[in-house]
Design a protein with these regions (language model features):
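A short, glycine-/small-residue-rich helix N-cap motif at loop->alpha-helix starts
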Residues: 25, 78-89
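GT-A fold catalytic core of metal-dependent nucleotide-sugar glycosyltransferases
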Residues: 86-128
Length: 128
């Protein structure tokens, strides 16, 4: 499964990761990307499940890192839904690829940043 993840893992010490299928990428990721870039100013990594060619082209123009994969039908034979599979991907990919010393914020793709992090949040972001 993990050998089929295409793309480069980010080398940043701190970044935000999210994952989604192609539908959620087009529906929610533009707002996610815009607001987190504007308010949090941390690198963003997105993992896209079953992306269409149009989505892959969009990714090339954005200032971020990305990986993607295509669903192996054998995985969906487990007693899990496709939605569960999609929801778990960011944690699975992160657990498999995270480098020593990386500090990663895991976020839902349908969330967005309303404002800059508070001082307390910023201190947490900068601590290690």
């Amino acid at each position: 499964m993990f050998e089929n993840v295409i793309g480069d893992w980010p080398k940043h010490e701190r970044f935000i990761i999210t994952s989604c299928d192609d539908r959620y990428f087009n529906q929610y990721f533009p707002r996610f990307y815009k607001t987190f870039n504007e308010h949090w100013q941390l690198p963003i990594h997105v993992h896209v499940i079953d992306p269409k060619n149009e989505s892959l082209k969009k990714l090339q123009y954005l200032k971020l890192s990305h990986t993607f994969c295509y669903t192996d039908s054998n995985i969906l034979k487990w007693p899990y839904s496709f939605e569960t599979y999609c929801q778990a991907q960011r944690f699975i990919v992160l657990g498999h690829h995270m480098l020593e010393g990386q500090s990663v914020i895991v976020a839902d793709v349908d969330c967005y940043a309303l404002r800059k992090p508070t001082k307390q949040q910023q201190d947490i972001l900068e601590s290690d």
